[in-house]
Amino acid sequence: MAELACFCYPHLENDSYKFIPFNNLAIKCMLTAKVDKKDQDKFYNSIIYGIAPPPQFKKRYNTNDNSRGMNYETVMFNKVAVLICEALNSLKVTQSDVANVLSRVVSVRHLENLVLRKENHQDVLFHSKELLLKSVLIAIGQSKEIETTATAEGGEIVFQNAAFTMWKLTYLDHKLMPILDQNFIEYKITLNEDKPISDVCVKELVAELRWQYNRFAVITHGKGHYRVVKYSSVANHADRVFATYKNSAKSGNVIDFNLLDQRIIWQNWYAFTSSMKQGNTLDVCKKLLFQNMKQEKKPFKGLSTNRKMDEVSHVGI
């Protein structure tokens, strides 16, 4: 994750701003600079290589002292920065909005995936600039539309029916901020269209998850798509979701946290997010993740969501 101010800076033209991508030499200069505390939140002028990000974001970049940041000296960083600027420059951002826009935290890996989709000649995003910009605006929180299959970050499609598409995420192969844990495996499920879904399509998806992915929990971060994650990573996802939800509320950005379809979501996660929306503390909410919950009734005849160890699938071993 990183703020948009880590990729570009605003330049006032008439009554709105144009956004310009940083070059990596300017960033490198900023990372070596000694800057007064009172200037940490200001864009840094490298003199030689142009404007650089505010020094307060130093930890967002990979250095000898910090291996958890972005590999900003890669070609991919430049591609992501340019893509962000193209999307922002399609909007009219005024002085009252610019600080809020640049402070928004976005998924670096999501944006790299959109670059990969854009460069794939077989992908619809290669052929449609309009759809590409729409996808980026959704990714950076500048659109109220949800991420559907056409505008999704992408990956390897492992399941699809009339209503849903399930993607295996390819973060292990990334250049900008790769996941280093070789055991990482995670999926995302997007809606093909943002419209009511038939019970038949839901049952098809639940059956696929029940028999092929029952080593995983189906959760949501509240943004209109599902995530399929290892049970061992659920607590970590809970911490992140809770922190994001509370920070958004604190900063005045009221978000409509979408609980999605209770028949698909792991019931403990549904209880966790429902409790979070009611205003309970993190400890109270997380206890619900580890409780043995009895399902009131089976959502579909012939399908159970209970995990039986003699029926566990091989996906995820």
From Swiss-Prot:
GO MF, one annotated term: metal ion binding
Subcellular compartments: Host cytoplasm
Cofactor(s) annotated in UniProt: Mg(2+)
Region span, RNA-binding: 205-241
Domain of life: Viruses
Key words of the record: ATP-binding, Host cytoplasm, Hydrolase, Magnesium, Metal-binding, Nucleotide-binding, RNA-binding
Stretches assigned to coiled coil: none
Gene Ontology cellular component annotations, sorted alphabetically: host cell cytoplasm
Catalytic residues identified in the record: H225
UniProt: ATP binding residues: S107, V108, R109, K188, H221, G222, K223, R227
GO biological process, any: viral genome replication
EC number: 3.6.4.-
Keyword Nucleus recorded: no
Function description: Participates in replication and packaging of the viral genome. Plays a crucial role, together with NSP5, in the formation of virus factories (viroplasms), which are large inclusions in the host cytoplasm where replication intermediates are assembled and viral RNA replication takes place. Displays ssRNA binding, NTPase, RNA triphosphatase (RTPase) and ATP-independent helix-unwinding activities. The unwinding activity may prepare and organize plus-strand RNAs for packaging and replication by removing interfering secondary structures.
Subunit description: Homooctamer. Interacts with VP1; this interaction is weak. Interacts with NSP5; this interaction leads to up-regulation of NSP5 phosphorylation and formation of viral factories. Interacts with host DCP1A, DCP1B, DDX6, EDC4 and EIF2S1/eIF2-alpha; these interactions are probably part of the sequestration of some host SGs and PBs proteins in viral factories.
UniProt name for this protein: Non-structural protein 2
